[in-house]
């Protein structure tokens, strides 16, 4: 038993800085990339082996057909390619030269585009191993492979039956005097079905609202017993509670819908002004989607190829901050890029951003990136323990005979 405690304790001394499941777009033609497990667009892109497919959707902002092929790679818990695996270890069928065949041109839209859809598994390839996956999409008509890379998309596949049991609870009772602004995540993990003999065999990732910028990797448990771990009062699992995500719904080009202040046509684009986001000194419950988005219009028919694109204008009323202010959501793919950075207007004391976006429902928040790279909440957005945050826990395991990490447990607390 003492040896087990030593192994488990060593496990949680290991730290990782490269962990991140992030989609990445390399070509400006690609817009509205969405990766969904089954029909659950409100959660992480997760599915269990042999169950619901992973859906990858995106738009190419032309009406020209492009021959897009894809390659699937298995990744370890740290999102490095599982170099020790052969393709046949994790995939049955074909990989690398298969073409995305589900293609639709937009109909009667101001900006023409072509919508592409891919489901994994499909008739050409089926996944046979749990874990992390990365898909790379190429334009086969490009002059070389580097120029042909359009984007990468990531998702997770769990075991058909979980090999661990997770129990999650969020509470405002914390170990430090911040009960009004923070949440303590408590966890219990039953790993009695696993044989753990080395600290590198188990890896645990904790996410708040699907964010990887504040992910907690391998938090050290405060209670250990045979086959079980427990995190009850762990400082690493105390999160800023923040505030409810903001949201808007752009469904109609003629009439403002939820959260839209005005819609104008300038002769070439629809200019859509989201209502000004004012400071929030008090908590008010509002059911939002924690950064998720859903493409649709008022007709809600053939959304993939009938929705319009428009220039969406965001305005945040706030004092000038010591760091750069960014829009953050699933649809920014967790990336702090210049296009998501807001500009400050000293005259009006407001931040502004304009993004080219497709009709639909969007939820979002504002985050601040400091000069040294840390990410913080904006004081004007509020920080309240009552906030309905979502927590996800991923449990990876590598048996002694395995050559990569498998995803043996997944938990979500809403």
Residue spans of the language-model regions?
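Contiguous beta-strand segments within globular domains
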Residues: 28-76, 177-189, 299-314
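Ligand-binding face of N-terminal immunoglobulin V-set domains in extracellular IgSF glycoproteins
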Residues: 110-140
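Long, internal scaffold/assembly segments composed of regular secondary structure
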Residues: 197-283
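Aromatic-rich carbohydrate-binding modules that target alpha-glucans
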Residues: 91-116, 212-219, 224, 311-359, ...
């Amino acid at each position: 038993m003492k040896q087990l405690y030593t192994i488990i304790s060593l496990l949680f001394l290991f730290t990782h800085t490269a962990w991140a499941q992030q989609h990445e777009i390399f070509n400006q033609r690609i817009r509205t990339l969405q990766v969904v497990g089954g029909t659950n667009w409100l959660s992480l892109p997760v599915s269990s082996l042999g169950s619901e497919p992973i859906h990858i959707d995106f738009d190419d902002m032309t009406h020209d057909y492009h021959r897009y092929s894809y390659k699937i790679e298995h990744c370890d818990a740290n999102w490095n390619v599982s170099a020790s695996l052969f393709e046949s270890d994790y995939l049955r069928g074909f990989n690398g030269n298969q073409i995305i065949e589900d293609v639709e041109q937009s109909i009667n839209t101001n900006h023409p585009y072509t919508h592409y859809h891919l489901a994994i598994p499909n008739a050409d390839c089926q996944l046979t191993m749990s874990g992390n996956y990365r898909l790379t999409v190429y334009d086969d008509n490009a002059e070389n492979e580097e120029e042909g890379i359009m984007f990468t998309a990531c998702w997770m596949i769990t075991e058909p039956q979980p090999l661990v049991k997770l129990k999650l609870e969020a509470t405002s009772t914390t170990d430090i005097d911040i009960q009004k602004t923070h949440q303590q995540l408590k966890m219990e993990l039953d790993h009695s079905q696993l044989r753990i003999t080395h600290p590198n065999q188990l890896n645990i990732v904790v996410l708040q609202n699907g964010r990887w910028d504040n992910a907690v990797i391998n938090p050290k448990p405060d209670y250990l017993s045979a086959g079980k771990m427990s995190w009850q009062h762990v400082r690493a699992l105390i999160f800023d509670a923040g505030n409810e995500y903001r949201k808007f719904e752009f469904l109609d080009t003629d009439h403002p819908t939820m959260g839209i202040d005005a819609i104008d046509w300038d002769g070439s684009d629809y200019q859509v002004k989201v209502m000004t986001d004012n400071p929030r000194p008090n908590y008010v419950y509002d059911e939002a989607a924690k950064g998720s988005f859903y493409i649709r219009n008022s007709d809600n028919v053939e959304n993939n190829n009938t929705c319009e694109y428009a220039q969406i204008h965001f305005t945040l009323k706030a004092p000038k901050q010591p760091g750069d202010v960014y829009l953050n959501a699933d649809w920014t793919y967790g990336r702090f890029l210049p296009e998501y950075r807001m500009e400050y207007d000293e005259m009006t004391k407001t931040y502004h951003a304009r993004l080219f976006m497709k009709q639909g429902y969007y939820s979002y928040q504002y985050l601040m990136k400091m000069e040294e790279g840390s990410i913080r909440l904006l004081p004007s957005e509020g920080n309240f323990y009552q906030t309905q945050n979502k927590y996800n826990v991923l449990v990876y395991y590598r048996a002694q005979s395995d050559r990569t990490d498998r995803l043996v447990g997944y938990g979500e607390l809403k």
